């Protein structure tokens, strides 16, 4: 891809420069090789990006619209086991994740494979719960849309560093589905802990 440029007052386009200490993963990714990868997500080791920060793991979703599938959640579950000194879940795509792949759900429904739906949801819930209880810091760094399952992955992170263009939420009811990846529980727990912290 071409470098990001901005037009200056002298009508010349110049490359956008990043402030000191700011790193765009998209630029670094070109020279990195994932330690684990499938058709929907990749797992990278980050070393030397900041002073004293080494052995971080970064998960990047890269399916169509970053829709979450079994393959995506395999990488999320894997990073919970091989977590290094910390985990970052991020990508520089237009959308962090448009949620769970509804085409996969439609296929389950068309086949009347209700056990398949239950098994998928169990795997999704297991992966995000492993992420939540990983003994290292887990940082979610979304940009763009983080809907449904994408939001539910982020809800299980310890901290979020959210881009100003981010739109997040549980949108399942718009398509007639109840959110089932733990996002309702995590949203409630955060709200409860914040509103009752004074007691």
What are these regions (language model features)?
Residues 117, 125, 129-199:
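Conserved catalytic cores of soluble enzyme domains
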């Amino acid at each position: 891809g071409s470098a990001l440029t901005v037009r200056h007052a002298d009508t010349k386009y110049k490359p956008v420069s990043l402030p000191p200490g700011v790193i765009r993963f998209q630029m670094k990714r070109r020279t990195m090789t994932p330690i684990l990868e499938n058709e929907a997500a990749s797992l990278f080791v980050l070393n030397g990006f900041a002073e004293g920060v080494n052995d971080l793991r970064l998960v990047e979703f890269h399916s169509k619209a970053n829709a979450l599938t079994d393959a995506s959640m395999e990488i999320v579950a894997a990073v919970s086991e091989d977590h290094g000194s910390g985990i970052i879940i991020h990508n520089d795509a237009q959308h962090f994740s448009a949620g769970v792949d509804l085409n996969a759900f439609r296929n389950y429904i068309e086949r009347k494979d209700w056990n398949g739906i239950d098994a998928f949801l169990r795997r999704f819930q297991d992966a995000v719960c492993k992420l939540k209880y990983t003994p290292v810091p887990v940082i979610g760094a979304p940009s763009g849309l983080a809907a449904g399952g994408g939001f539910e992955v982020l809800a299980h992170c310890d901290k979020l560093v959210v881009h100003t263009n981010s739109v997040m939420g549980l949108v399942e009811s718009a398509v007639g589905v109840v959110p089932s990846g733990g996002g309702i529980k995590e949203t409630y727990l955060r709200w409860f802990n914040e509103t009752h912290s004074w007691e």
